[in-house]
Amino acid sequence: MSIFDEVMSSDFTVFKNKEIFNLDYIPEIIQCRDAQLKSVLINIKPLLDNNKAINSILIGNTSTGKTTVIKHAIREIEEHTNLKTCYINCNIQDTLRKCYFQIYRVLFDREARRGLSTELIQEEVMKKLEEQSCILAIDDINYLSKNDANNLINELFRSNEFYHLNIALIITINDETFKYSLEKNAQSILLGHEIRFNDYTKDEIYSILKYRCNAGLKDHVINDEQLERISNYSHKIASLRRGLILIQVLGQTIESESRCKIEDEDIDKYVPY
């Protein structure tokens, strides 16, 4: 049997659900961010009665749950309401033009025609938004250039001066200094309803990783002492994501060796203390 056949034919696994450890996985239960999620939903709620929503500005370091809260809120809204939602990831849609093309794609369920100017796309978007309520989530806006961020913020927040729109904006920022580097108009707009995401505590990281392990790994694959060690390491480097990646890598490693549980020596290779 070739190595390929051996690997592909094996059904041995230590995982119940590998997807749970993916960085883009949205859990059914949001841990340690209930208050923030509730605030976002409260701000959006007026849209259900066709009233003006409160815009939300989510501020916190990387790996503090902002994206998870946004995506969880969007999922709930899509499941329980008829509101249109548009998620923009400024790591990918990293220019003003790309942001408007993403909004257009969601609103019209098709790609914009090639060759159209950003101004024409923006005009089409604004006209469409006059017809329906919409939630626009702009994640990591600090990845836009300052000029593009200034324009996007001003255009969307000031749109009611020229268009009869009923939209809710959710913006995340992981670098607070970026906010103060913008033009005064954009800065004043961002002084809206700020929702703070403090760094996770050691206990919160442990709780989140424990929940993921219970849902994603088979019983006895990792013990509490090992999980606490990974949690301490993740807390020290301020990265919950690192803990999730590490558990996934450890699981895949022992699975490839047909072992049923993680040993302390396995963790020694990745955790320096």
Describe the residue ranges of each PLM region.
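Alpha-helix termini
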Residues: 46-51, 77-80, 159-164
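Walker A/P-loop nucleotide-binding motif
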Residues: 50-72, 92
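Residue-level recognition of the N-termini of beta-strands and the immediately preceding loop/turn
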Residues: 53-56, 83-86, 133-134, 166-169
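Post-Walker A helix-loop "phosphate-sensing" segment adjacent to the P-loop in P-loop NTPases
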Residues: 75-84, 108-111
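Conserved catalytic segments around the Walker B and adjacent sensor/switch elements
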Residues: 55-57, 79-92, 193
